[in-house]
Design a protein with these regions (language model features):
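Short, flexible, solvent-exposed loop/turn segments with mixed acidic/basic and small polar residues
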Residues: 38-44, 139-140
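Internal alpha-helical scaffold of NAD(P)-dependent oxidoreductase catalytic cores
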Residues: 42-132
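Rossmann-like NAD(P)(H) cofactor-binding subdomain of soluble oxidoreductases
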Residues: 1-38
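Residue-level detector of flexible, active-site-proximal loop/helix-junction positions
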Residues: 5, 30-33, 57, 84, ...
Length: 182
């Protein structure tokens, strides 16, 4: 179970297979920015997607056992290659986490934190909630998935550059279309 699969499959997949141990990666797409037993939830996996990565081609019977486990705790399962998993989660989890932290840093760097606390509302809270996740864990996730994260980050920087150009040019229509497409 974990947020990055490629490095795990590379490091242990073939070794375990040679030793006769079945290895299938699992990543339930569920979680919270909160840590500790006091924040445990019996509903955490309800209706969540669990990604199974079977790059070592473990026999279908074993894969189905693992799939049934995840289904019994409430997940529905999909299968994909580790590289596809890492690329996908970079887009929908890792980059959003980094951008959430960026929003916090951008708001606080040089700003009046007391005033900002008074005027911030739901949009800021919703955008920055995930940045409250455990920093050491997230640093590890981002670093382990660096190739996919860097590719997505370059795409995000390119789009931010375009937004900056539209703002500098006063191009409200381009901004409107970009926001509408989101």
């Amino acid at each position: 179970v974990g947020s990055v699969k490629g490095c795990v499959h590379q490091a242990v997949g073939s070794v375990l297979k040679k030793a006769g141990v079945a290895f299938i990666g699992s990543h339930p797409m569920a979680g919270s920015e909160k840590q500790g037993m006091e924040h445990a939830s019996g509903d955490l996996f309800r209706d969540a997607t669990c990604i199974l990565t079977n790059d070592e081609h473990v026999h279908e019977d074993v894969l189905l056992l693992l799939q049934r486990f995840w289904e019994r705790v409430g997940c529905h399962c999909i299968r994909m290659k580790a590289a596809d998993h890492d690329s996908s989660v970079a887009r929908i989890s890792h980059i959003p986490h980094a951008l959430s932290a960026l929003c916090v840093h951008s708001a606080l760097d040089g700003g009046d934190t007391k005033l900002l606390g008074l005027v911030s509302a739901g949009g800021f809270r919703d955008t920055t909630r995930v940045s409250m996740g455990e920093p050491s864990m997230w640093a590890e996730i981002l670093a382990e998935n660096a190739p996919a994260v860097l590719e997505r980050l370059d795409e995000a920087l390119s789009q931010l550059g375009q937004v900056r150009n539209w703002l500098a040019a006063g191009d409200k229509e381009a901004l409107r279309e970009w926001l509408k497409a989101a």
